[in-house]
A protein has these predicted regions:
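N-terminal helical capping/dimerization or prosegment-like subdomains
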Residues: 2-104, 332-336, 347-348
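Active-site metal-coordination/substrate-binding segment of hydrolases
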Residues: 88-159
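Flexible glycine/proline-rich, aromatic-decorated loop/lid segments
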Residues: 197-198, 210-221, 422, 426-434, ...
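Active-site-adjacent substrate-binding region
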Residues: 249-258, 278-282, 289, 376-426
Length: 467
């Protein structure tokens, strides 16, 4: 039996929901929102976004629940279409997050919370990370409801808070406090979740590829703490915490440049699909030649950096704090370091190595540690994603991959739920898509949504509907 949701999909409604959600400044942390919110109330932004989604689903007769699992204003929303009759299979989850990172509004060409639609492009914070997917998953839920299709499993919509800061107020907290939200009436956790950071197209040479995320790196957010002797800036001495911190950060950068590569299976398969077998072959034995081969094959710098980061553990200093006054030698200083680990890396051993690298200049302290995760790339739902992409774009090639960021998939792994990154978008080769994540002038073409919405709906219908 063929299930066709296309007649029930509302692209205009999807775009409207995206624009409306962008106009809700659900910035994480909330206190980072006021200046950028252009007079709009920034408090409770995530709960406001959750209530918006709940109202859309409630209006269609879909049961919903808004939950503030830890703190007022840090809300998430769950919606559920129940199986028609007894569920024969565990649920499918449509997972997204409604929080967004802060903006530097002065660096934007348009109001980052305006949701402007200009020349077929929607602008605003969250347009690609990831309110576009929230809107598409809302549209799919509405289409399932309108169609009256019989479901063999529950379909759960989950748009959660706090993904951008580890999920304590969102997925992580909900998994711990309300695991039943991720399961059916028989207590079976979801068989799969469709999540972010995959599905989009990348162009390599003259070929177009569609990514399907089947793994993601681990996270160890780390603090460097340097201490010294405070004093007057006019009388320098050798125990300056600022100098120690700078030396520690410099040592980390030099160590990163020497860090060896390790090609994990998900990355080896991705490189093979892209025709970059030579990069995979050389990465572990001749890094200079591997780098040259990668540079020659991938001229686009952000994609090239992404692939390079797939090949090794990384430690990136991102935040520095030292000193409060120009004429005072700091007695302490801190740096924040974003450490990302490949599947199979011993995170404690890597931290020990980083401590050796910085030596006595600073103390290395882990703040948040989350493991790398991997899922089978031959799962039924991956096959459905591949089939739907090939049908929609016969000239494109699906490619399973590992991503370097982290997602709420790490929290759901505690329940045994595999999360596949699949927010399908067909993008022109000149769209700097990867650089728009957390970047200025975040935006998404409506044409990309027009491609992706029926592809996503096809996967959901084939996986969830009764045959």
């Amino acid at each position: 039996m063929t299930i066709d949701l296309a007649p029930h999909l509302d692209l205009d409604g999807c775009v409207t929901h995206l624009r409306d959600l962008i106009r809700i400044p659900s910035v994480n942390p909330p206190e980072a929102a006021p200046d950028a919110a252009a007079g709009r109330d920034p408090r409770g932004g995530e709960t406001a976004a959750a209530r918006y989604c709940a109202a859309v689903l409630d209006g269609a007769g879909i049961e919903t629940e808004v939950i503030e699992v830890t703190t007022p204003g840090r809300g998430s929303v769950f919606g559920r279409l129940r199986a028609t009759g007894p569920a024969t299979e565990p649920p499918l989850m449509l997972l997204s997050h409604i929080d967004v990172v802060p903006v530097d509004a002065e660096s934007w060409s348009r109001d980052p919370f305006g949701g402007d639609l200009v020349d077929g492009v929607v602008w605003g914070r969250g347009a690609v990370d990831m309110k576009d997917m929230v809107a598409m998953e809302l549209a799919v839920m509405l289409a399932l409801k309108r169609s009256g299709v019989e479901l063999r499993r529950d379909v759960i919509f989950a748009a959660v808070a706090d993904e951008e800061a580890g999920g304590t107020h969102g997925a992580r907290g909900l998994v711990d406090a309300r695991p039943e939200l991720f399961a059916d009436a028989d207590g079976r956790p979801a068989a799969a979740a469709i999540n972010e950071v995959g599905g989009y197209s990348v162009t390599v040479g003259s070929r177009r590829f569609y990514t399907i995320q089947v793994a993601e790196k681990g996270i160890v957010w780390t603090r460097l703490r340097a201490t010294g002797t405070p004093g007057h800036g006019s009388m320098p001495h050798d125990d300056n915490a600022t100098i120690k911190l700078a030396a520690a950060v410099t040592a980390l950068a030099e160590d990163q440049a020497r860090r060896p590569a390790r090609v994990v299976p998900a990355v080896r398969g991705f490189l093979a699909t892209l025709g970059l077998d030579e990069v995979a072959r050389l990465a572990e034995t001749d890094p200079v030649a591997a780098s040259a081969a990668l540079n020659a094959a991938i001229p686009e710098p952000v994609l090239r950096r992404s692939i390079d980061a797939m090949l090794r553990d990384t430690a990136t200093p991102t935040v520095l704090h030292a000193g409060k006054k120009v004429n005072v030698i700091a007695g302490s200083g801190e740096a924040e370091v974003d450490v990302r680990t490949l599947p199979g890396t011993d995170q404690e051993a890597l931290l020990d190595h980083l401590q050796e690298v910085v030596g006595s200049n600073a103390l290395v302290e882990p703040v948040i540690s989350l493991p790398a995760v991997e899922w089978p790339d031959n799962a039924e739902i991956v096959g459905l994603m591949t089939d739907a992409l090939r049908a929609a774009d016969p000239d494109g090639t699906p490619a399973t991959m590992m991503i370097t960021p982290g997602t709420d998939a790490k929290a759901l792994m505690d329940l045994g739920i595999p999360c596949y990154g699949f927010a399908p978008l067909r993008l022109e080769a000149d769209v700097p898509f990867l650089s728009l994540f957390h970047g200025h002038d975040e935006r998404v073409p409506v044409s990309a949504l027009a491609f992706g919405l029926p592809v996503l709906a096809e996967v959901v219908a084939r996986y969830a509907a009764r045959p």
